[in-house]
Amino acid sequence: MTAAGRAAIALAGGPSGAPAGPGALAELIGASLYDAVTRHRTRYLAAYELALESTRQPALAGAMSRLGAAALGSTLAEHRSLGLPTTPGQVQALIALYNSTLMTLVVAPPGTVTAEAALVLARCLVTGVLRPEVDH
């Protein structure tokens, strides 16, 4: 995450410097999804191709696993730096849902995904993950 991204989400938490909340997190994720689908579309298509190839090559699978673990650690650290109270399990769920959402968006025809659509999906993602667990 860039310094500008951290500043934007920190500001979204409120002028008092309060920690960022779910709304700010959804805004950040929505912007990230849209940026990935537009400016970095080819990069993410290649990353998904690589992930699929890792199912056939054990050495690549190991490297992808290490990459995933590093992504979890760095994302959790970013959440802490922003004052987000997400648990490691919630961060892992956010990453999984982000990747699934990004895959859906990146295979859509170029130019068809809007920033608003990415934000709606991001809000659903954050709401679902951060919702208090309900006893069954």
Predicted regions and their residues:
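Short juxtamembrane and helix-loop transition motifs at transmembrane-helix boundaries
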Residues: 24-28, 51-54, 121
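Charged catalytic carboxylate motif
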Residues: 28, 46, 70, 93, ...
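Hydrophobic alpha-helical connector segments
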Residues: 2-44, 91-94
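Hydrophobic/aromatic-rich alpha-helical bundle segments in the mid-to-C-terminal region
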Residues: 61, 65, 79-136
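Amphipathic alpha-helical segments used for helix-helix packing
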Residues: 38-58
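Short alpha-helical scaffolding segments that buttress acidic/His motifs in well-ordered protein cores
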Residues: 33, 47, 51, 94-101
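A short secondary-structure junction motif
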Residues: 4-11, 74-78, 101, 105
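Short, solvent-exposed amphipathic helices
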Residues: 63-70, 74
